[in-house]
Amino acid sequence: MAKFNKDSVGGTILVVLLLSLVCSIIVAGSAVMLKPAQEEQKLLDKQKNILNVAGLLQENTNVKETYAKFIEPRFVDLATGEYTQQADDSQQAIPADADKARIRSRSKTTEVYLVKDEQGQTQQVILPIYGTGLWSVMYGLVSVQPDGNTINGITYYQHGETPGLGGEIENPNWASLFKGKKLFDEQHQPAIRIVKGQAPQDEHSIDGLSGATLTGNGVQGTFNYWFSKDGFGPYLEKLHSGAN
């Protein structure tokens, strides 16, 4: 039998292939083992963001316990504005003239989060929103009071906008400008306005972001879409009337 020569060209190639195979197995195994931990962290981050916009996140908050105690997730059929028992993630194309958020499509249902008090009464409803800014899709949450119109708080938690400019959408000082503003006008049309420079002191206007007009336009488009009849409009109208 011929003796294996690891220093030959064939031997070198074989050693490289074996090492590559071993490394691939290690990497694949690590990915499988880490996936549950990654999914757990993803869920924890989601719960933190929800508690944060609800005003329930403090430095020493037990996220899982607080979320389980005060947050009730519900699925909403966006077309009817009614609660549904099951999620329907099938995508619906958004006509170009209606796609103010520039997201092209959305699922038929979405998850909303009811914020309860100690007696189990709903004090806020948290709605997920997303839309395209200058460089990225911007993901946020809006907390709305039970009247279906008054903003309790907002947060943007994921985006790729320019740090120090469009990235200021995640600045708590800017987010605080939304508190107490009204989502709709008297005709129940989306009424939030991102104003370049200093906004007038009214129920609907928000100061724009300095040096980030296009990101501000993206936020404007996001609110225009998600609080229209094609987004959360029907749901919030039912919430306001007490139908939900």
UniProtKB/Swiss-Prot annotation:
It is a single-pass membrane protein. Keywords: Cell inner membrane, Cell membrane, Flavoprotein, FMN, Ion transport, Membrane, NAD, Phosphoprotein, Sodium, Sodium transport, Translocase, Transmembrane, Transmembrane helix, Transport, Ubiquinone. One of its GO terms (biological process) is sodium ion transport. SMART domains: FMN_bind. Its cofactor is FMN. The chain crosses the membrane at residues 13-33. Its main location: membrane. HAMAP family: NqrC. Composed of six subunits; NqrA, NqrB, NqrC, NqrD, NqrE and NqrF. This is Na(+)-translocating NADH-quinone reductase subunit C. It comes from Haemophilus influenzae (strain ATCC 51907 / DSM 11121 / KW20 / Rd). The gene is nqrC.
